[in-house]
Amino acid sequence: MKLKMLLLSSTPPGSPGGQADTNTTPATPTTSTTAVDSTSRQLTTSKQPQQTETRGRRYGRRPSSKSRRSQTQQRRSRSRHRSRSRSRSRSKSQTHTTRSTTRSRSTSLTKTRALTSRSRSRGRSPTTCRRGGGRSPRRRSRSPSTSSSCTTQRSQRARAESSTTRGARGSRGSRGGSRGGRGRRRGRSSSSSSPAHKRSRGGSAKLRGVSPGEVGGSLRSVSSKHTGRLGRLLEEARDPPVIIVKGAANTLKCFRNRAKIKYMGLFRSFSTTWSWVAGDGTERLGRPRMLISFSSYTQRRDFDEAVRYPKGVDKAYGNLDSL
């Protein structure tokens, strides 16, 4: 309403809507016009900042609040605190591990030193027991277990001597075994080797072989002594067993060829076919013959049980002084 009144009052007197006031003075319309201008300016100025504010809010950047800054700072400080605590815990664990490793190394070093000291004391103890107790009392104080070590050494020597004597008894059968035993005994001890050498030599002399004069000396079967396989073979070699076969020459040759392949290992050797000749001339007497030799009586028995002789062939057992 005030604005309407002001506008009505501000109309010029010559306009059709307004009437001329003769009583009024000309100074009043100027004052009213100035007031209207000032009010309109104030309204326009008040509208302009509002428009700029709305434009800034729509398209401009939001101002950062104090609360958001404080929250981000708190988060950063918390993350820094956590990282510091983690680094501290890691450093502590590393220090603990280094301490444990150093402790284990120190304990291992102490153990190795103790073991080396014990081995040194054990290495020194046999010298003390050899020299005697009166000369070195200090070494006794260092190694209190000298008597036990001496006893153990004596027991070991006794065992070694017994093993050497057993080896000498077991190596009577072959020359190679006796030679190997000699080399070992020389490396072990020269004092204990001499009686063992004598025993092994005496035993090997009996089992070396059979002299020509002794062949066929015993015409009995081999006794069941505990002489071993080699001794039994050597005793049976004194009178080797033989089978003599009589028959036609061709049948004997065929039988020999078959037996060499079929009965391998059940005989020692085959002879060729032969025949007796009369003393007055060169005529053959009787049928041809063939000899089959064996290394033992058991081998001859096994051969005789396994072989099937051809028809028209006769057999007979025998022994020879030598083959």
Swiss-Prot record:
Q: Which GO terms describe its biological process?
A: regulation of DNA replication
> Which GO MF terms does the UniProt record name?
DNA binding; DNA-binding transcription factor activity
Identify the keywords attached in UniProt to this record, alphabetized: Host nucleus
Disulfide bonds listed in the record: none
**UniProt-annotated location(s):** Host nucleus
Q: Mind telling me which Pfam families this protein's record contains?
A: PPV_E2_C (PF00511)
**Keyword set includes Hydrolase:** no
What is this protein's function? Plays a role in limiting the replication of viral DNA in keratinocytes. Recruits the host NCoR/SMRT complex to viral replication foci to mediate repression of both viral replication and transcription.
Protein name, as recorded: Protein E8^E2C
Q: Which organism is it from?
A: Human papillomavirus 5
